[in-house]
Amino acid sequence: LVNIKDWCKNTFEVVNQLRINTDNSFQRYDVMLLINGIPAVQIELKTLGISPRRAMQQIVDYKKDPGNGYTKTLLCFVQLFIVSNRTETYYFANNNDRHFAFDADENFLPIYQHAAEDNEKITHIDDFADSFLPKCALATTISRYMVLVASERKMLMMRPYQVYAVEAIDQCIRENRGNGYIWHTTGSGKTLTSFKASTLLKLNPDIHKCLFVVDRKDLDRQTREEFNRFQEGCVEENTNTAALVRRLVSDDYADKVIVTTIQKLGLALDENSTRNKNRAKRGRTTYSDQLAPLSDKRMVFIFDECHRSQFGQTHRTIKNFFPKAQLFGFTGTPIFPENATIRQIEDNVASLRTTEDLFQSELHAYTIT
């Protein structure tokens, strides 16, 4: 029905004032966007001066109507809704009744406003249409930046700044132009952003492995659970360093995305670590020797809260062991020269290290000031 390999090659159509009869009444929808004849986006418009929240309530009422088109017709394929009164424009994902409610207390599923890459809001319907609704842009939003949480039967939409961050990482990797960091404020959904970046890299045949690296065991478990919430069976638990090494050397597609702690990774790579020394004493191949064939592979490392544990020997070990790797960091509080406190000693010269020193360039920023 739909070309999912190249969404831009599908046929896009616009239908105005679509009318559908229900069991008890009829409903008329202002604008419907179709992909290959399948309704994908519904737009409800209000006149200037009337709150677009009236349109939101109207959609909720439509969905509550017995025998409504969202359950008995092709409207069940609608992915997202857009509401506007011309100067204010919002959009939100289609969901089942459990996650779809709106009342005077604003008990509502997440509502979004579009924004430019510099985070400036795009609210006027004309500007919104120019930015959000071009055929390829809309198809990309639906195909790449909406996440179905199957266990909760809930659809999530990535916010604009999350999309820009993922696209910046993706472009940096496609152009193979070094490392970078994402500065997104605490609580802005970095786990979802990093999940999407990691899983899109899984589709890139030029990348051998993608590792999402955290600095504490509890974050390892928490991140793994979140990744698997977004996509069931996305990552497996690495109970110890040996399990991590097995997945690193595995050619199984399921092991292409790995969540681990920086401590496990450091123990595996450092030939002077206790584990590697003990294996050598027993005549067993060390972890670092097992991983040696990966040294010429294109690897991607994404570090969570990269301001915490990226200063030190482990970071240098990773960069030295994987010379073709690209490293990306997520942080809510980057280290700048004015707040740098950790000194890096190289060639007997001590200097303060910043986030930019380690990750080269800021790829995207979203801060609340």
Question: Language-model segments: which ranges?
Answer:
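Structural beta-sheet core signal
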Residues: 81-83, 212-213, 301, 329
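Short mixed-charge
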Residues: 1, 71-73, 236-241, 346-351
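Short alpha-helical segments and helix-capping/turn motifs at coil-helix boundaries
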Residues: 15-18, 25-27, 63-69, 241-247, ...
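Signature of the SF2 helicase/ATPase Hel1-core->accessory helical subdomain module
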Residues: 52-55, 263-369
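ATP-dependent helicase/translocase motor core
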Residues: 1-209, 218-234, 252-257, 263, ...
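Conserved helicase motor
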Residues: 217, 238-247, 262-267
